[in-house]
Amino acid sequence: MKKGKLLTLLPLMAMTLAGCNLNQKSSFSFDENKVFNIGVCQIVAHPALDKATEGFKKAVEEGLGKDKVVFDVQEAAGEPATCATICNSFVSKKVDLIMANATPALQAAANSTLEIPILGTSVTEYGVALSIENFSGTVGGNISGTSDLAPLDKQADMVKEFVPNAKNVGLLFCSAEANSLYQVNTVEACLQAQNITTKRISFTDSNDLSTVLSGNIAGLDALYIPTDNVCAQNTSIIDSICRPEKLPIICGEESLCAGCGIATLSIDYFALGVKTGEMALEILKEGKDISKMPIGYDTNPTKKFNKAICQELNITVPDGYVEIVVE
């Protein structure tokens, strides 16, 4: 969506909701007979995002009862414009809550309504996603949710853990994903602080990924890929280019690592979905004011490694890493 439009909407969201007092807990009364309708917009079918949706549904069903909630789960096949269509349809149906899975879904939802509560998940950085300057951890208005951001400084440290002599590291990301750039900026600074030379390798979409990556890996000792939806959808392409060159890849999340990486410090997307579902229950069942709900995080990311690729690249796995189970 257009950042300018979103920047205009966000202050209006706060003022509109503050004026209407939509979530005043003092006047809230839970109707045990009500059947809630929840719209779920997911940018694309992907193992990590799928787990987040599953966790969300499980938590809500357990909290409300399966017979008291109806989910309308729709996927946008990777198209932000389709997210907008989906979210607008949810607004027309007057759903009780929208769960937006991934940044494009959140942006579309934010642009579709100022009244219906919106919970994001699998969103790396809400300040970046919603163009909020000096983001303090609470969006305000009708938006909150959970973040899939893992400690980026610790991900950067993994490069030296697995490739001790690394001096030149590439940073692969899709230029269309603002959250990817945020991660790259942070990791790059951490690597440079360790006297590692970095090289940004950005591509526009899946059509130019192969050409861009192939033309930029010469001389690299390792590659870092952030949590990036386009990269996650194209791990087979990345693997087919990097593995023959014996180029180890540190990844931002588990499913990406399972497809092409050697190691990751990854959050649990199912648990993240559960946390998002618990936030939904606080809103729907307890009348909690979403405008005051801070963004939630998985505070226990796990160090994981891809056994097959580590063995093929003859890489020694440090203690404390758990093998990724490839489904």
Locations of the language-model features?
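C-terminal motif of bacterial Sec signal peptides marking the signal peptidase cleavage site
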Residues: 16-19
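Bacterial signal peptide processing site
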Residues: 21-23
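Hydrophobic alpha-helical segments within soluble ligand-binding/sensing domains
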Residues: 30-31, 126-168, 267-288
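Extracytoplasmic "Venus flytrap"
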Residues: 32-57, 63, 72-82, 228-230, ...
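An alpha-beta-alpha
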Residues: 38-40, 56, 144-191, 289, ...
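Beta-alpha junction/loop-to-helix N-cap segments that form part of ligand/metal-binding clefts
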Residues: 72-134, 228-243, 247-252
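Pocket-lining segment of extracytoplasmic ligand-binding domains
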Residues: 178-247, 253
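Flexible loop/turn connectors
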Residues: 256-308
